[in-house]
Amino acid sequence: MIIIKLLVIGCDGQLGKEITKILSGENTYEIIGTNKKDLDICNFKEVDDFILKHKFDVVINCGAYTKVDLCESNKEKAFLINSFAAKNIALSCEKTGAKLVYISTDYVFDGKKEGPYYESDKINPLSIYGKSKALGEIYTKMFSSKYFIIRTAWLYGDGNNFVKTMLGLSKTKDCISVVNDQIGSPTSTKDLANCILNLINTENYGIYHGTCNGFCTWYDFACKIFELKNINIKVNPINSNEYKCDAIRPLNSVLYNHMLKINNMDNFRDWQDSLEEYLENI
């Protein structure tokens, strides 16, 4: 039996946890997971030594600085983790011939397009977070020849996320306000993890969009959460300019899984179905 050596960087994040959980039941994988305490991905020598020592077949880079508003005031940290660390990992993977997965975001787009974004659409990030992830994409393409860049959006799983925030607010408030002029596709880490694990068994390298099917506003998302959990709470729809935050968000974050569909690999469920399953298990 061939054993695949796989590294999950950022194993304690939502997606990293899901990938590790799914693979823990597979006897064809030898998995090592690292967090920022185990491996400083911003230190090239440390990354290089670690990857060369273990000679991984696949490296999944889930490590990121995802606090979108804090990125605006911590620009150096954002680029260090989201861009230059991605470069370190890509350089080391290329030395060993490892396949590399880089998780990217809908924030690389400006949200001004009418209709969903395809992988081939021009990127134009509005925020520091989006710009740092866009540069991470560039470095990944530049220094790795076996890369899968997967852009996703509105992710939820085992950790802090919009779903947990809404459920938490419902315990202390009778009425909340939620943005209703930004659209996107709520995406389960379970669906995304399965997509990644299918991709790494191929050599169909390139950029992919990976989100659940369908789209909604944050307001619609919140209402569906409360509906599925039978929670009685008033939800007020508001515009983005009424919700004060440091980073500009794209109004249209809908990604079309075009490349997955071309490769017959789009196994994402409708966002409502994935959400219902998630809520049944938390």
Can you describe what each PLM-predicted range is?
Residues C195, T202-A247, L251:
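Mid/C-terminal beta-alpha module of Rossmann-like enzyme folds, strongest
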